[in-house]
UniProtKB/Swiss-Prot annotation:
GO annotation, cellular component aspect: cytoplasm
Reactions performed catalytically: a ribonucleoside 5'-phosphate + H2O = a ribonucleoside + phosphate; a ribonucleoside 3'-phosphate + H2O = a ribonucleoside + phosphate; [phosphate](n) + H2O = [phosphate](n-1) + phosphate + H(+)
Enzyme class, UniProt record, top EC level: hydrolase
Keyword annotations: Cytoplasm, Hydrolase, Metal-binding, Nucleotide-binding
Signal peptide residue numbers: none
Names of required cofactors: a divalent metal cation
Record: residues binding a divalent metal cation: D8, D9, S39, N92
InterPro entries given in the database record: SurE (IPR030048), SurE-like_Pase/nucleotidase (IPR002828), SurE-like_sf (IPR036523)
Name of the protein: 5'/3'-nucleotidase SurE
Gene: surE
Cofactor binding annotation: Binds 1 divalent metal cation per subunit.
C-alpha cells in the first residue's frame, strides 16, 4: 500500500510523525506536509505565488507556506511517484467534530485527496496525549481497506478519544453534530497602541445527539463519519425552485 500522508499541524507535529512511524511498518509512506502550523486553513489553495519544497534526510517533504490542500495537490501530481493508493491526513492535535469540518485543514487535505480520485481518511485525536492510540486505530482501518476496499466515494472523518488503546470501547459510524456559533473575539493592544484581534474558541455543543460524532467520542468510542465533497442541498431543491417562482425572480429583473 502506498500512502500519501499530510496534515495541517505541520511536518514536525507529533501526530503526523507518530502516524508515519506506525504506517511505515507495513506501507510505503510519503509525507508531504506544511512547513508550519496551518490549522484552520480549510480548502485554501495557493494560486498567487509559487511553492517551494524542502526534503529532509528521512524523505519527508515540507511545503514552505503551503496549505494542506497545496500539499496533497503537489504530492499527488508531482512529488509521489508512483502515485499513492490512498491519502491520509493527520493525526490532528485536537478533534474535528461537527462544524469543525468546515474549517479544518486536516479534513481539507483528505477532501483534496478524494477530489483527485483517491480514497481518503482524516484522523484527529480528541486531545494531545495518546497519539499512539490514534495511530493504532488508523493502521487497523487501513489494513481493513487493504483487505476489502470501501467503495463509497466518501471521505472518512475519524475522531479518536484521547485514551489508552485498551480503554477504547469500540467504533461507531456517526453523523456530524453541530455547535453554537462562535462569537468570542479577544482584543489586545500592541506596544504602539494599535488594536489586535484574536479569534476565540469554538462554540459549545448544540446538537450532540446519540448518533453524533460528539457523543461517540465523549463515550469513549472512535467516531467514523462519512463525508462527501458535493455540498448540494438536494432536499432543498424543490423549495428553492418554488420560492423563485413565487417571487418572480427570472421573469422580471
Amino acid at each position: 500500500m502506498r500512502i500519501l500522508l499530510s496534515n495541517d499541524d505541520g511536518v514536525h507535529a507529533p501526530g503526523i510523525q507518530t502516524l508515519a512511524k506506525a504506517l511505515r511498518k507495513f506501507a510505503d509512506v510519503q509525507v508531504v506536509a506544511p512547513d508550519r502550523n496551518r490549522s484552520g486553513a480549510s480548502n485554501s489553495l495557493t494560486l498567487e505565488s509559487s511553492l517551494r519544497t524542502f526534503t529532509f534526510d528521512n524523505g519527508d517533504i515540507a511545503v514552505q507556506m503551503g496549505t494542506p490542500t497545496d500539499c496533497v495537490y503537489l504530492g499527488v501530481n508531482a512529488l509521489m511517484r508512483p502515485r499513492p493508493d490512498i491519502v491520509v491526513s493527520g493525526i490532528n492535535a485536537g478533534p474535528n467534530l461537527g462544524d469543525d469540518v468546515i474549517y479544518s485543514g486536516t479534513v481539507a487535505a483528505a477532501m483534496e485527496g478524494r477530489h483527485l480520485g483517491f480514497p481518503a481518511l482524516a484522523v484527529s485525536l480528541n486531545g494531545y496525549q495518546h497519539y499512539d492510540t490514534a495511530a493504532a486505530v488508523t493502521c487497523a482501518l487501513l489494513r481493513g481497506l487493504s483487505r476489502e476496499p470501501l467503495r463509497t466515494g466518501r471521505i472518512l472523518n475519524v475522531n479518536v478519544p484521547d485514551l489508552p488503546l485498551a480503554q477504547i470501547k469500540g467504533i461507531r459510524v456517526t453523523r456530524c453534530g453541530s455547535r453554537h456559533p462562535a462569537d468570542k473575539v479577544i482584543p489586545q493592544e500592541d506596544p504602539r497602541g494599535n488594536t489586535l484581534y484574536w479569534i476565540g474558541p469554538p462554540g459549545d455543543k448544540y446538537d450532540a445527539g446519540l448518533d453524533t460524532d460528539f457523543a461517540a467520542v465523549d463515550e469513549g468510542y472512535v467516531s467514523v463519519t462519512p463525508l462527501h465533497v458535493d455540498l448540494t442541498a438536494h432536499s432543498a431543491h424543490d423549495v428553492v425552485s418554488d420560492w423563485l417562482d413565487s417571487v418572480g425572480v427570472g421573469t422580471q429583473w
